């Protein structure tokens, strides 16, 4: 006989084959046979294996054939076989007395027949039983594993843990794994069935609207069938162990019903009491009472029965009434030996149940702060004693100390669960506010249903106040901003009058009533008579008037206190408690009243109920307010549609004008000078402007290309002209000039080669509509005044409005010039129009300019990409919008005055409405700075734009050249302003610029410059001539800047005269002007006497007449030195 362990431990060079003869195998005992039959394994074959032969009945041959070629693999195979042997994985023979080959982890194959050896064979069941029950006697027919086998298994696990794990997962028999699992579980400490550690997770996982109690498992765990075993186990413990075991039993219990039941059962075990009751403290600080959580619970009473009985027959005991009430009030224990002899004992319960109460032990349950949270009461001893002794009292007191902690924890847990459910309900209500915003009845019904279910009340009502919800007044209340400077008169009146006034104002118009669980909500509109005869309506009226929350425990008493009359006795008889709360909107205005009537258990509403109900009232107010706002918004939208229809009708040109324009003969483009960059509209009448627009459309071949009906085009042009306001600059003629410049750029400037026909159509439409309904004010003014346009459009305010007006005209009947376009072309052209109109905002120009300059600097010549085309169109729109700066000087000068007048009008509005100082270009008092500001505008915006366009597209050079010419004119005008020679002396900018007459052709020597020419000789008539120096007068009358320096032109002329006189040559200009300047300056430095003429030297003062007299005449040399310093 070859032993498996010996083969595993032997050192052989080749894989051995061990054959066990039938005579060398000991016969299996019946127990071993049964064990082997119970541990059959399914073998797996990886390759061809040696066939296993079996002998009849009681003989089994074990053949081990190794496929590995190394000693280590052979050893591992045998070790794994040893593991199988130790864990009982021997397989029984098949019905054909054959065994299937089994693959080992190391690659070997083994044919194993069910064999057992007295030295190394053991079943898994025997091993587990021997380890789990060390003191039990083993079966004589089983063999215990030797220490060597255990060491071999441990060594294999240490050397090959991965192989061991693989064997367990892949080849271990299910029976062995099951026994191993049972063995592991038996080594763990027993799990306490009373502690529901996963209770909170089950609460959270359950539906908050359906699951209201802890899972039913808590009730079934304490069933009567398991009590006898528990009781026998506890009876075997001594008193200390029993006490600690019962404390552990309630320590971690979170279900308040289960906890109270365990407390009463455990107290009965500790004190041998027959039955017990547990009361929990409820109510407010001024109205405390006890509620029987569980009543008359014995050790055999099931939890489910106890809870059902307590819920159906709720017992309420006020503090100070009865034995339990007295204990709760005094916090003192009461031990009664004979209950019927105590006056505080109520024998009615005994009479109902037939039970006789002898001894009573009643003790308070306090929390860690010493406040009463409950009262426990036990009745009658069961061990033959007639009373509870001091030992029972001490045990009862000590146990209730721990129970107080458990009860408070359970109550906190219950509060957290209730808060969780409350939050879930409020989230659902928040969703409902948006889901049901168009149906007030459904929304209020859903809120009332949730409130009724959560707060356990019989009925719920909502009264809605008759509010002034008309659209106009409602919007006025929202938009109206109180003026801080406005002082409103005091409206102090008597409180009684104020109450009556509010009462009349807060009249209910809608009543929502929700009854029992299966009753539908009732919506009614009660009359004034019905409201006056309803006590509930009177209470609601009181709450709506005062804005206070009312929690009524006794309706009759409240009615008497507030001097109300009880009109309906049946209504009062069915009402015990009312919780009434106002519903307010976002403006803190009472819009309704919510009522809860009667708690389901008959107790008053608590502060906790009021707190929860407040959240419902808030959500109800939000829902009602949101629904009313939604209804008002829908009405306003309907009104807006009607207004748009009216506006569209009045914005459309009338039929007579359309027919007249349709029949008119449109002249050629050359007659209107449309191809020229010097086009001007001053000579065109209004009808000619419309004909010029038609000619541009026809010259671009847009009418035939896009099949635009001619009458529709005429009507659209007239409608566009009609929708421009008669402001000074941003009017219809400005739109015509912008469109003509775009036409000239496309035709004369050859820009049409970069555009498609659809884009040309969009650009011309955008130019004509880019300032529709302009009000003569810019975007900044709209933002400052917070106009409706600024509220509607946050960026590019006026430009968005212009585009919307364009769309409105196109959508008007008979004005859609895009009607023949396909949907794709329509979207494309509308996108072009929108982008082009928005590009006229200079803020957009500055955003796009850098990107456009970068493309130009990189030598871009292909402008067909979408982004590049958008940049190009934006630059072209800006170039057309400011093209007046490139017109001939006569036209540019006149247009600039129109722009300035419009800007000055806006500045006046800012001073009047906003009480702010406008910027310089809009300040009428600084109109003399306009030429300088024009130069800045050209340098910052116009010249960079036209320069880059001219460099890229040389055919539009006239725009750049015209801008340069106008810049020179404005610069010259700005210099002359410094001399006081321009329009600043006029109230309006409508006179030509003052010039030096004949400066171009005549010799300067023939022109006599005087102080009067420089506006320095005019005397002030408004100030005291004796005390006011000349240099303190109006700056517009001086010839020098405020800094004392002369203008550039004046310095040039004066220096030329000075140099000619110094080198002895004949001066071309008289030095009278020089002497006047110097004399005036000298006079300014000395006080003016009454005898001297005001304003210094006046008249014709030559150089030869400057003789000294009485120290007042300055020498000619000194004058020239002073003049040089001045220059």
UniProtKB/Swiss-Prot annotation:
Keyword Cytoplasm part of the UniProt annotation: no
Active-site positions on this chain: 730
Chief place of localization: membrane
A GO molecular-function descriptor: 3',5'-cyclic-GMP phosphodiesterase activity
Record's subunit section: Interacts with PrBP.
Family per record: Belongs to the cyclic nucleotide phosphodiesterase family.
Name the record gives this protein: cGMP-specific 3',5'-cyclic phosphodiesterase
Name of the gene: Pde6
């Amino acid at each position: 006989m070859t032993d498996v362990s010996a083969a595993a431990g032997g050192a052989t060079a080749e894989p051995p084959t061990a054959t066990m003869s039938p005579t060398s195998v000991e016969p299996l005992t019946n127990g071993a046979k049964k064990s082997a039959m119970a541990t059959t394994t399914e073998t797996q074959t990886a390759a061809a294996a040696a066939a296993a032969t079996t002998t009849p009945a009681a003989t089994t041959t074990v053949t081990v054939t190794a496929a590995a070629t190394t000693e280590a693999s052979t050893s591992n195979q045998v070790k794994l076989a040893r593991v199988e042997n130790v864990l009982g994985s021997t397989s029984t023979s098949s019905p054909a007395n054959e065994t299937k080959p089994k693959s080992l982890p190391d690659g070997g194959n083994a044919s194993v027949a069910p064999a057992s050896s007295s030295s190394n064979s053991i079943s898994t069941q025997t091993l587990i039983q021997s380890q789990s029950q060390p003191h039990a006697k083993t079966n004589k027919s089983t063999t215990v594993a030797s220490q060597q086998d255990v060491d071999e298994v441990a060594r294999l696990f240490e050397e090959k843990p991965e192989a061991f794990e693989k064997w367990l997962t892949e080849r271990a028999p299910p029976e062995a794994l099951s026994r191993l699992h049972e063995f592991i579980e038996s080594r763990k400490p027993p799990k306490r069935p009373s502690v529901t550690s996963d209770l909170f997770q089950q609460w959270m996982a359950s539906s908050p609207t359906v699951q209201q109690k802890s899972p039913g498992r808590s009730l079934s765990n304490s069933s009567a069938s398991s009590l006898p075993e528990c009781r026998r186990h506890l009876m075997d413990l001594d008193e200390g162990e029993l006490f600690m075991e019962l404390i552990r039993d309630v320590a971690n219990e979170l279900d308040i019903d289960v906890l109270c039941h365990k407390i009463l059962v455990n107290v009965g075990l500790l004190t041998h009491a027959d039955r017990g009751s547990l009361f929990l403290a409820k109510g407010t600080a001024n109205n405390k009472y006890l509620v029987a959580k569980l009543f008359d619970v014995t050790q055999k009473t099931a939890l489910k029965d106890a809870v059902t009985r307590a819920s159906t027959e709720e017992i309420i005991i006020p503090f100070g009434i009865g034995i339990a009430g007295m204990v709760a009030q005094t916090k003192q224990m009461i031990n009664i030996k004979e209950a019927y002899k105590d006056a505080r004992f109520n024998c009615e319960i005994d009479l109902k149940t037939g039970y006789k109460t002898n001894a009573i032990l009643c003790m308070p349950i306090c929390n860690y702060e010493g406040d009463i949270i409950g009262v426990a009461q036990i009745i009658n001893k069961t061990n033959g004693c007639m009373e509870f002794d001091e030992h029972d009292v001490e045990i009862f007191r000590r146990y209730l100390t721990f129970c107080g902690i458990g009860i408070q924890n359970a109550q906190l847990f219950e509060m957290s669960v209730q808060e969780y459910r409350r939050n879930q309900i409020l989230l659902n209500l928040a969703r409902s506010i948006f889901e049901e915003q168009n149906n007030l009845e459904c929304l209020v019904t859903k809120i009332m249903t949730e409130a009724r279910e959560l707060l356990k009340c019989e009925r719920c009502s909502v009264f809605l106040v008759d509010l002034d919800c008309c659209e106009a007044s409602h919007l006025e209340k929202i938009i109206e901003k109180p003026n801080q400077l406005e002082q409103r008169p005091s409206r102090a009146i008597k409180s009684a009058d104020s109450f009556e006034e509010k009462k009349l104002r807060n009249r209910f118009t809608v009543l929502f009533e929700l009854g029992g669980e299966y009753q539908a909500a009732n919506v009614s509109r009660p009359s004034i008579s019905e409201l006056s005869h309803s006590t509930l309506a009177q209470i609601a009226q009181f709450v709506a008037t005062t804005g206070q929350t009312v929690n009524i425990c006794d309706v009759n008493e409240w009615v008497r206190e507030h001097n109300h009359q009880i009109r309906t006795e049946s209504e009062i008889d069915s009402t015990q408690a009312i919780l009434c709360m106002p519903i307010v909107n976002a403006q803190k205005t009472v819009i309704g009243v919510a009522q809860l009537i009667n708690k389901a258990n008959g107790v008053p509403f608590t502060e906790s109920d009021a707190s929860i109900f407040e959240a419902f009232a808030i959500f109800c107010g939000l829902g009602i307010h949101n629904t009313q706002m939604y209804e008002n918004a829908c009405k306003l939208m309907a009104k807006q549609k009607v207004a748009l229809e009216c506006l569209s009708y009045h914005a459309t040109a009338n039929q007579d004008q359309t027919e007249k324009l349709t029949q008119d003969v449109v002249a050629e483009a050359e007659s209107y000078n449309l191809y020229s960059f010097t086009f001007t509209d001053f000579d065109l009448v209004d009808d000619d402007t419309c004909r010029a627009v038609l000619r541009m459309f026809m010259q671009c071949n847009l009418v035939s290309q896009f099949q635009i009906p001619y009458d529709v085009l005429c009507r659209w042009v007239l409608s566009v002209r009609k929708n421009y306001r008669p402001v000074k600059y941003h009017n219809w003629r400005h739109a015509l000039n912008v469109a003509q410049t775009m036409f000239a750029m496309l035709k004369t400037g050859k820009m049409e080669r970069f555009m498609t026909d659809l884009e040309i159509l969009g650009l011309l439409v955008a130019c004509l509509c880019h300032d529709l309904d302009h009000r003569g004010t810019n975007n900044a003014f709209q933002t400052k005044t917070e106009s409706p346009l600024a509220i509607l459009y946050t960026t590019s305010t006026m430009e968005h409005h212009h585009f919307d007006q364009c769309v409105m005209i196109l959508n008007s009947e008979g004005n859609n010039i895009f009607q023949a376009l396909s949907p794709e072309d329509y979207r494309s052209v509308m996108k072009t129009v929108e982008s082009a109109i928005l590009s006229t905002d200079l803020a957009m120009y500055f955003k796009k300019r850098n990107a456009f300059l970068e493309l130009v600097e990189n030598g871009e010549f292909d402008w067909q990409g979408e982004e590049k085309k958008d940049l190009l169109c934006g630059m072209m729109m800006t170039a057309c919008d400011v093209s007046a700066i490139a017109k001939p000087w006569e036209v540019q000068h006149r247009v600039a005055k129109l722009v300035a007048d419009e800007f000055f009008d806006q500045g006046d509005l800012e001073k009047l409405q906003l009480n702010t100082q406008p910027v310089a270009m809009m300040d009428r008092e600084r109109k003399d700075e306009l030429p300088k500001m024009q130069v800045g505008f050209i340098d910052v915006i116009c010249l960079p734009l036209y320069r880059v366009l001219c460099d890229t597209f040389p055919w539009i050079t006239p725009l750049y050249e015209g801008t340069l010419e106008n810049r020179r004119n404005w610069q010259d005008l700005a210099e002359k302003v410094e001399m006081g020679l321009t329009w600043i002396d006029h109230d309006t900018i409508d006179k030509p610029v003052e010039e030096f007459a004949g400066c171009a052709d005549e010799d300067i020597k023939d022109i006599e410059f005087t102080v009067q020419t420089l506006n320095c000789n005019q005397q002030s008539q408004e100030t005291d001539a004796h005390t006011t120096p000349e240099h303190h007068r109006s700056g517009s009358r001086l010839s020098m800047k405020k800094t004392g320096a002369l203008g550039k032109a004046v310095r040039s002329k004066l220096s030329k005269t000075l140099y000619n006189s110094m080198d002895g040559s004949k001066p071309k200009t008289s030095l009278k002007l020089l002497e006047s300047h110097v004399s005036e300056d000298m006079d300014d430095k000395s006080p003016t006497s009454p005898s001297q003429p005001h304003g210094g030297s006046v008249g014709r003062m030559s150089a030869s007449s400057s003789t000294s007299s009485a120290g007042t005449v300055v020498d000619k040399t000194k004058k020239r030195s002073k003049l040089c310093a001045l220059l």
